[in-house]
Every structure is written in C-alpha cells, then in structure tokens.
C-alpha cells in the first residue's frame, strides 16, 4: 500500500513509533495534511499487541507501515536509517525508555541534526509524575479540566477521552511538530518537542481561567454560563428521547429561541440573565421541548437564527445536510470517517488512504529508503 499525499505538508517525512491514541491522532493529522508518515510496528502475532496499539480505523489512515524489533540491535539500526532521512520522529514511550533502547533524542539528532524529535506523554518529560502511569481522565483531572464538567451537586463526568488524548494531546503534538518544522527553516536544525497531555489539557482551560479572573465563574459547578447552569446554554430531551442543543446566549438569539418555542409572549417568563429565574426557565424549556420529536424541533428551527441544533450521534452526523454539503465526512475503505481539516485553497488535501494492514501492507525499511532519497 502506498499512501496518497497531497496538501501543505507534502514532502515532509515522519517516522511514527506505534502507540496508543494521542500520538496516532497527531500523526493522522500530519498525514491528512500531506506528510509521508511511516508507522513502525513491533513484530508479533495479532492479539494483545494489537489491542494495545490498534492498527486500523481513522487514527491509522494515510500511513505506510514497516515492522522493526526495537529491542534488538538490528531493529534499532533500521530505525536509525529511517531517522537519517526523516524530518520528524514521533514516540510516545515513558520518559527515558527511548534513550535506554538506543534511539533517544541525542542519538537521533547526531545522525540527523535537522530532525524534529516529538515526544508524546501524559505527564511530560519531567516533574514528580513523569514516570507515573495514567490515562486521559487522570491528566484532565490534574489539569483542572475535569472538575468543571458535570451538573450541580453531582460528580464530574468522564467526557470520553477527547480533551486529554486528542485536544490536549495529539492535536497539540501536531501543532508542536509544525512549529518546530517552521523554526527549522530559520535555524537549520531540529529540536525536541515535549508534548504532555496534562499541559495541553491545562491550555484548553485558558478561557475558563479568564472567567475566573474576572469573577464570571464563581458559582459551583453546574451554575455557570457555559457548564449547563444557564438554561439557554444546555440540552433538552425531546418526545422521542432525542436531544436538542441550545446555545442562545445573546439576547437577539434568545428572542428567536423563545419565538421558536412559542414562549415569546409569555409575560411570566423570567428574565434571561437573572440566575434566580434559571430553574423556572429550565422547567419551561424542558416542558416545551418534550412536546415534539427531535426531527420536528429541527424542522422548526431550521430557518431560525436561534443557535439551536439537533444532538447527533457519530453514526448519523454525516447525514446532516450541512455536513453532507461541505464533505465534513468521507468514506475511507468502506468506512465513514471525519474528513481532513482544515481546508486549503492552493494545496488541498488528498482523499485519505485506508489504514495499512500490518501483515499485508508492511514494507521493508530498504524499500522505504528508496523513496526517501
């Protein structure tokens, strides 16, 4: 299999050491933007190893794949031969593991001073927790990103692994790689990128810290403007057990929301920005949304600028007319997946190629090197 390349990163060569979600997502972004990404898998039969580092699906698309035993001298030698011709190496081992195996930053950059050596971890390369195990929920907990999530009086809820693994992890890794590549154009040398999920998750709370600094986020969880405390920024159940999302924060949009709900002329409705009336507003909105199905409310608000939208599942989002018109989702290898983003007018990205099969599509290092002259 040969991955198709097109986009602003065409010609950039990336070596990715197979790992879990954050680094593969960051490398997917790089591949989507045109980079030639070669994933280095560990040898072994399918089973536990594949569960530990999935080899299919959207996160693995757009790559070529080779297999190396990085615990053997020959495997390390093969990796270093790739490093000599690569622009970027991405690894997600715990701190010190790559050094112990013989392909840490110093060794690799001695071979290739222009190499961007990107490291993806949960806690970062230093600090008291650097060597500690963890997952998304742990990183966002320590970063202060988990505590604000949840209803008033209830425990924080686990928001999938979108914030730590992907938003604060893989996406920030990709940003770091791009920044280092840009800086290399000025300095002529690469550098180490230390991308930590706890750092990225903390960065995602920048807006919240701004609210805290101005006193606009002072109430307990679930009583603030953006955490479901405000009835005009929340979700509501419909008669068919669907949901509608409401984000009518500004008075102009709020007025249209009330019109769509048939509440515009209700003299007893509390004022929008009076928190003492929010419970009553929520009760009224809840009752009204429960009168119709999700599709009926979607039709009612289709032509109203009220900041109201249906809550779609990942299996149906591609069917929404707006997403269909923009091509927000694409079919890759018979599977519906999010399309590459963002979009570029002069250097558009190519249709992603399916994830390579490690057994069928793996190619020797020497074959890759012939294409990296």
Q: What name fits each language-model region?
A:
Residues 47-56, 314-360:
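Active-site-adjacent capping/gating segments
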Residues 157-168, 190-192, 223-227, 231-233, ...:
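A short glycine-threonine-serine/GTX helix/turn-capping micro-motif
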Residues 238-242, 294-295, 339-373:
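An anion-binding loop in the catalytic cleft
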Residues 143, 169-190, 203, 207-214, ...:
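Oxidoreductase and adenylate-handling cofactor-binding alpha/beta cores
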Residues 1-189, 332, 353-373:
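N-terminal helix-loop segment corresponding to the beta1-alpha1 unit
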Residues 44, 123-124, 197-202, 240-242, ...:
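Glycine-rich beta-alpha junction loops
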Residues 37, 302-316, 373:
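Short, well-structured beta-strand/strand-turn elements
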Residues 232-304, 308, 368-371:
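Aromatic-enriched alpha-helical interface/lid elements that frame and gate functional surfaces
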């Amino acid at each position: 299999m040969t991955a198709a390349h097109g986009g602003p990163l065409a010609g950039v060569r990336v070596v990715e050491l197979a790992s879990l979600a954050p680094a593969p997502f960051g490398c997917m972004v790089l591949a989507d933007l045109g980079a030639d990404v070669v994933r280095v898998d560990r040898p072994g039969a399918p089973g536990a190893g594949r569960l530990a580092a999935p080899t299919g699906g959207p996160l693995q698309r757009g790559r070529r794949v080779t297999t190396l035993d990085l615990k053997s001298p020959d495997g390390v030698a093969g990796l270093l031969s790739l490093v000599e011709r690569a622009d970027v190496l991405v690894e997600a081992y715990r701190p010190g593991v790559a050094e112990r195996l013989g392909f840490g930053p110093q060794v690799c950059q001695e071979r290739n001073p222009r190499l961007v050596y990107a490291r993806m971890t949960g806690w970062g390369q230093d600090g008291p927790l650097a060597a500690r195990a963890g997952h998304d929920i742990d990183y966002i907990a320590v970063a202060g990103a988990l505590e604000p999530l949840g209803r008033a009086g209830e425990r924080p809820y686990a928001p999938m692994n979108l914030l730590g693994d992907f938003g604060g992890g893989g996406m920030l890794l990709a940003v770091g790689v791009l920044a280092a590549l840009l800086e290399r154009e000025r300095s002529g040398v690469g550098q180490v990128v230390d991308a930590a999920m706890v750092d990225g998750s903390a960065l995602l709370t920048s807006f919240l810290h701004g609210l805290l600094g101005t006193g606009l986020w002072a109430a307990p969880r679930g009583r603030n403007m953006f955490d479901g405390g405000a009835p005009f920024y929340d979700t509501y159940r419909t008669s068919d057990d669907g949901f509608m999302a409401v984000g009518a924060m500004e008075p102009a949009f709020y007025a249209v929301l009330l019109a769509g709900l048939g509440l515009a002329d209700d003299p007893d409705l509390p004022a929008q920005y009076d928190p003492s009336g929010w419970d009553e507003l929520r009760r009224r909105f809840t009752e009204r949304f429960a009168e119709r199905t999700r599709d009926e409310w979607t039709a009612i608000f289709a032509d109203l600028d009220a900041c109201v939208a249906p809550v779609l599942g990942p299996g149906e989002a591609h069917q929404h007319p707006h997403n269909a018109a923009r091509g927000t989702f694409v079919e890759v290898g018979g599977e519906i997946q999010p399309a590459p983003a963002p979009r570029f007018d002069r250097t558009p990205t190519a249709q992603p190629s399916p994830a390579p099969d490690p057994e069928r599509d793996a190619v020797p290092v020497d074959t890759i090197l012939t294409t990296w002259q």
